[in-house]
Every structure is written in structure tokens, then in C-alpha cells.
Amino acid sequence: GLTIRAGSYADELVKTAKTIASPGRGILAMDESNATCGKRLASIGLENTEVNRQAWRTLLVTVPTLGEYISGAILFEETLYQSTTDGRKIVDVLIEQNIIPGIKVDKGLVPLAGSNDESWCQGLDGLASRSAAYYQQGARFAKWRTVVSIPNGPSALAVKEAAWGLARYAAISQDNGLVPIVEPEILLDGEHGIDRTFEVAQKVWAEVFYYLAENNVQFEGILLKPSMVTPGAESKDKASPTKVAEYTLNLLHRRIPPAVPGIMFLSGGQSEVEATLNLNAMNKSPNPWHVSFSYARALQNTALKTWGGLPENVKAAQEALLFRAKSNSLAQLGKYYGDGESEEAKKELFVKGYSY
């Protein structure tokens, strides 16, 4: 008969996933590629040098008590092997903070031949050996971001390619001890309304779970990183947090098995406050999975602007990051009331055609 080999890491994967999906905690996404990190640094007038990237990443991981609100941090490969400015391994600093190190493993988006100007995500070649090396280095979870564009269709081909790539990556990750974060980002770009987003998201998640099952991925040992269901960024319609929560939870209930331990939303260019309000609205009533956050810009933005590259601003910048982490922690518990928010935190962070 057909035997499915239980992976040697099965129990560990479940434990890792549950730890990341623990009450009041979420993920700090700090896996921007060096090029994107350079854009962040340029926005505060800094050059994109390894020293500056190291200074910024050191600021992020050394925030005192960060581990109370953050359970995992996604790193870019450079960061997984990097040390802080005072010479401690970044991985060790995270572990001391009670934060599980994760690693971005995809190799970016490239044009998908035969599609309607769409992309696919590369990085499966050599993934098994890279994953094993990342595990040795201390990583315990992985991330693979593929994208679906609504203005471009999306074509059946692009959706299938996205879903299949995610499923292969997930199987390879689990085989090497890493909990895969499954991320088919449905881009905010476009003028479409919320109903169109909902329709596309249903299609995408149906295919993703079909292929995850076909690849014998253990659902208890994965995490999801979906987009919230919102109108397109250029749409005339704006949706309240209540409406975003209603549509998004409806999608999850229809498509995501309760075996999945955690759903860690991406912010996808929402403002810091918007991302927190939407998450809070989704946690107003109990859910079958841990519904939390995996934010990059929506955790880092105010901290970056506060820092401005100046050593004397490090403490204030770290406090800004901690404030955001704490706000999202409250939102994970459904207890965020929007107190003490700055104008900077309310700024729209959407960038057209954004790439990590």
C-alpha cells in the first residue's frame, strides 16, 4: 500500500509552530533583501552599507523585553550569519530574547512565461541543502513569499504555479526541520472592490491547500501568512476594520483547516495603525486558529523614522518599535483601543509593485 513517511522532525515542527503562535505574540518580519533594506535606509538619508544595515538590525533585535510580544523574527540570509554591532551573534541575541529565528528562503520573483505579465517565485533548486544549513545555524522556521496580482487576472496558470511552488517549499522545509510560513500575497495593487479580492483569495487558498495535501505537508507544522481581504489600494471603496475582519474571517473559515496552528497576517503596505486595528477586529471573537501578525513596515516604520541613523536616537526608536509590538500584541488578544497613536503611525505605507 501507500506509506507516507512521517518526517523525523514531526514533533519538533508542531512545537515550533505552537510556540510562534502563542497568545499575545506575533512575528517581526525583518527579512528585507539588502536592496530593500537600502531603500529603507535611503528614506532616512543613510547609505546602503553593511555597517548601516547591521546598525539597523542590531537596533531591532536588541529592544529590551521585545520577546514578550514577538515570538519569531524572519531574517534575510545575511542577518542569519551576522553579528550585532557589539559582536554578539544576532541568532543568539534573538534566542536570549525568547524569539525564534526564521529565514527567508525564496530567491525572489521573476516573470512567469505564458502568463498575463505575472510573476512566479524561484528558489526550489538547492533548497533542501540550504534549509539544512539554516537549521544548523539556528533557524527553526522559513518563509517563502509568492504573489498574486488581481489587475492581471490572475491567470489560472499563475495561481497554480504559486500554489505548487509553496507546497514544494513547505514539504522541503518540513523535511529539514523548518516550519514553513506559507505566503501567497494577494497584492493590494488595483482598483477592484473587496468582493473581487474575496473571490480571488478563495481560489488561491483552495489551490494552496490542495497542493499542500498532495505534497504530504503536515498541517500542524505550518503557519500561514495571508493578506487581509481589503479593497484594492486604488479603489474608491474604503473598508472599516469591522468589514475587513468579516470578509477575512469568512475566507479563513471556508478555506483553512483548524489543524493549522497559526495565521500570521502580512500588513502589505497598510499604515501601522490600520494593520493593528484590522487585526484587533479579527480577534473580537474566538477563532479556531491563533490569528496574529507578521509585520515588517507596520512594525518598523515609526522606529526607522525616529532613529534617523543617529546613535542618540536608538533608545527612542526602540521604544517606538516596542510600542508597535505591544499594540499588535493587544490586538492579537482583541484588546487594542488605539490609545497614544502618533500621526506617523497613521501614514499609508503602500508602495505600488512592492518587492521585498
UniProtKB/Swiss-Prot annotation:
The active site is at residues 183, 225. InterPro entries: Aldolase_I_AS, Aldolase_TIM, FBA_I. It holds the Pfam family Glycolytic. Substrate binds at residues 53, 143. The record marks 356 as: Necessary for preference for fructose 1,6-bisphosphate over fructose 1-phosphate. One of its GO terms (cellular component) is chloroplast. The keyword Nuclease does not apply. GO terms for biological process: glycolytic process. Its EC number is 4.1.2.13. It is found in: Plastid, Chloroplast. It catalyses: beta-D-fructose 1,6-bisphosphate = D-glyceraldehyde 3-phosphate + dihydroxyacetone phosphate. Pathway: Carbohydrate degradation; glycolysis; D-glyceraldehyde 3-phosphate and glycerone phosphate from D-glucose: step 4/4. GO terms for molecular function: fructose-bisphosphate aldolase activity. Residues 1-6 form a transit peptide. The keyword Ubl conjugation does not apply. Keywords: Chloroplast, Glycolysis, Lyase, Plastid, Schiff base, Transit peptide. Belongs to the class I fructose-bisphosphate aldolase family. This is Fructose-bisphosphate aldolase 1, chloroplastic. It comes from Pisum sativum (Garden pea).
